[in-house]
Amino acid sequence: MRARPRSISIASGKGGTGKTTLTANLGIALGSLGRDVSILDGDLAMANLGIIMGMHKCEVSFLDVLTGNADIKDVIYENHGIKVVPTGFRFEDVHDVLSKVKRERVEEIIGELLQQTEFLLIDAPAGIADATIISIAAAREMLPVCIPTYPSLVDCYKTFGLS
């Protein structure tokens, strides 16, 4: 019997703490252990997971799924032995998409991804804006990330309170 899939939001209230790097490395490490892993760039405004994974030239991305222009299966790419869902790098429609993103739609997409994987790691955006709250709320678990500075610890604590 297959274990219940795990969805983990990797989050922090502060930028520059290593969320994206941790998401990529944890995903690759789990994949190297034979686990079925998907990683999703939940940072719609400042997407970097695709860059780190060497996938900055993807034709379609998570933004296309959110706007209804693609199906989730169209934006799952294989890299380093894991599945990667990059957000993309189009600047012209990011703010428009952000203003229209509904928590229910993100949860629906997360549900579709969870049917296809054992671990779903979500690289959440920094801060506590709507996009961050949606990324954290859509996951079943949260892994808070901070650096050893007082502002980072306070911001991490605030973010942890959202889960």
Could you tell me what each predicted segment is?
Residues 26, 101-102, 160-162:
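Short, solvent-exposed amphipathic alpha-helical segments in soluble enzyme
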Residues 15, 42-44, 89-90, 125-127, ...:
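Short, ordered loop/turn segments at secondary-structure junctions
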Residues 2-43:
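Walker A/P-loop phosphate-binding motif and the immediately C-terminal alpha-helix
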Residues 11, 50, 63-66, 73, ...:
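Conserved protein kinase catalytic domain
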Residues 23, 99-102, 152:
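Short, conserved glycine- and acidic-residue-centered signature motifs
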Residues 39-115:
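P-loop/Walker-type NTP enzyme "switch/lid" segment
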Residues 108, 112-115, 119-163:
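Conserved catalytic-core segment of NTP-binding enzymes
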Residues 3-6, 33-36, 80-81, 116-118, ...:
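Short coil/turn connectors at secondary-structure junctions
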